[in-house]
């Protein structure tokens, strides 16, 4: 049976919104949608793998077209196959993409590679005729758990958005089955943020927990001031206080904030993850890690990151990835992560779950769809299918 990649296609799509966090607005936000087209036919249709990058980092069409897609297409197809020769080997495809790339500088490059890598894994699981989460569990010798914790990310700053709108937004998430919600902080003065937090806590009561996210906005002084304010409240976590690479700042905060903290969404390699665990003072009994495979060289690299965690005494259950996409849902279900982010009202059609999947008591159950399961989300698959045709 022939198995080869015959084309890699990319289109940059808008996911813009008038929202903002403490650091950026999303008025010009884009994503790269990628199709990895193979010559394999299943049920009368050519197998195509799909991928896209997470929000917060822009589409990477230039890098994808100029460097990474061409390297895959120029490679000897036989050198991209597994030992049996009946499927692609994602690690070999990944290695082909990274030929002549120097180490370090994990920025936009990691997003471009991660986007293609997502599409490759989608194709691999489809060729195998299995949901990706079950394929991953088999490869790692663990039992898949299709029930995955999800939390609702929102609470952005928005023109004209007062406390009543913020409360209504959070109540809407609870009405849809979520029991952990997240809001932004750091984009307003600390006393205004305190009022916003108290309004949300009053709204959700004992029905849910609240996480807050500073998006890396604070210096140490401000981060400590917020820590002293936030420790008065029973928060799910205090997220990304300062610059993602300022490990000393992160380590210093533990003295002032005994509750759970979370970070990692803007660290894009297993080396950066290792430095966070070495120098960031993260506590494996309470803190959370948010590495996002779509932004950090893909699932091939994410598996290396999980190995780093293991050597430092961390469980994969302390990982709740950023991004709100189905790829991380599959990793969570297949490899035992602690859950996944969700954007119920934002960045559509790329976020969310397959049609018919509902949140119940803060969890969803993964359907048994081949690959990542994009075909089960009709509005998203419409965009993907148009790229592949």
Curated annotation (Swiss-Prot):
Active-site annotation: 184 (acceptor), 322 (proton donor/acceptor)
Keywords recorded for this protein, A-Z: Lyase, Magnesium, Metal-binding
Cofactor: Mg(2+)
Catalysed reactions, as listed in the record: (S,S)-tartrate = oxaloacetate + H2O
Sites marked Increases basicity of active site His: 292
Variant or mutagenesis effect after changing residue 322 to N: Decreased but measurable dehydration activity
Annotated binding of substrate, by residue: 21, 55, 102, 156, 182-184, 213-215, 239, 265, 322, 341-343
Co-factor remark: Binds 1 Mg(2+) ion per subunit.
EC nos: 4.2.1.81
InterPro entries in the record: D-tartrate_dehydratase (IPR034611), DgoD-like (IPR034593), Enolase-like_C_sf (IPR036849), Enolase-like_N (IPR029017), Enolase_C-like (IPR029065), Mandelate_racemase_C (IPR013342)
Matches recorded under Gene3D superfamilies: Enolase-like C-terminal domain, Enolase-like, N-terminal domain
MF term (GO), any: hydro-lyase activity
Residues annotated as binding Mg(2+): 213, 239, 265
Domain of life: Bacteria
Biological function: Catalyzes the dehydration of D-tartrate to oxaloacetate.
Additional comment: Reaction mechanism is a simple extension of the two-step reaction catalyzed by other members of the family: Lys-184 initiates the reaction by abstraction of the alpha-proton to generate a Mg(2+)-stabilized enediolate intermediate, and the vinylogous beta-elimination of the 3-OH group is general acid-catalyzed by the His-322, accomplishing the anti-elimination of water. The replacement of the leaving group by solvent-derived hydrogen is stereo-random, suggesting that the enol tautomer of oxaloacetate is the product.
Subunit and partners: Homooctamer; tetramer of dimers.
Family: Belongs to the mandelate racemase/muconate lactonizing enzyme family.
Name of the featured protein: D(-)-tartrate dehydratase
Source organism of this protein record: Bradyrhizobium diazoefficiens (strain JCM 10833 / BCRC 13528 / IAM 13628 / NBRC 14792 / USDA 110)
């Amino acid at each position: 049976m022939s198995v080869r990649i015959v084309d890699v296609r990319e289109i940059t799509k808008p996911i813009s919104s008038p929202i903002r966090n403490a650091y950026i607005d999303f008025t010009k936000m884009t994503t790269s949608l990628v199709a990895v087209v193979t010559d394999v036919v299943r049920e009368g249709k050519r197998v195509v793998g799909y991928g896209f990058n997470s929000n917060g980092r822009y589409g990477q069409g230039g890098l994808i077209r100029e460097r990474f897609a061409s390297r895959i297409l120029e490679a000897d197809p036989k050198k991209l196959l597994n030992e049996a020769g009946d499927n692609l080997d994602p690690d070999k495809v990944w290695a082909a993409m990274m030929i002549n790339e120097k180490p370090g500088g994990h920025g936009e490059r990691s997003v471009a590679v991660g986007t293609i890598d997502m599409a490759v894994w989608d194709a691999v699981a489809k060729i195998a005729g299995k949901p990706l989460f079950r394929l991953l569990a088999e490869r790692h010798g663990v039992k898949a758990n299709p029930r995955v914790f999800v939390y609702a990310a929102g609470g952005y700053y928005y023109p004209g958005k007062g406390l009543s709108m913020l409360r209504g937004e959070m109540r809407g998430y609870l009405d849809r089955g979520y029991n952990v919600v997240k809001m932004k902080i750091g984009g307003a003065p600390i006393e205004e943020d305190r009022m916003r937090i108290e309004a949300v806590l009053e709204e959700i009561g004992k029905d849910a927990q609240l996480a807050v996210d500073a998006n890396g906005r604070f210096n140490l002084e401000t981060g400590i001031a917020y820590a002293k304010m936030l420790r008065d409240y029973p928060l799910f976590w205090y997220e990304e206080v300062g610059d993602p690479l300022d490990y000393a700042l992160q380590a210093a905060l533990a003295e002032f904030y005994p509750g759970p903290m979370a970070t990692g969404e803007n660290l894009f390699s297993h080396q950066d993850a290792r430095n966070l665990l070495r120098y960031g003072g993260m506590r494996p009994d309470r803190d959370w890690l948010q590495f996002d495979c779509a932004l950090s060289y893909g699932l091939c690299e994410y598996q290396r990151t999980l190995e780093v965690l293991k050597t430092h005494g961390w469980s994969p259950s302390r990982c709740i990835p950023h991004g709100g996409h189905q790829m991380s849902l599959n990793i969570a279900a297949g490899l035992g992560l602690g859950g996944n982010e969700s954007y119920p009202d934002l960045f559509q059609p790329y976020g969310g779950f397959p049609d018919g999947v509902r949140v119940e008591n803060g969890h969803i159950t993964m359907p048994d769809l081949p690959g990542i399961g994009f075909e089960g989300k009709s509005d998203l698959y419409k965009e993907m299918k148009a790229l592949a045709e």
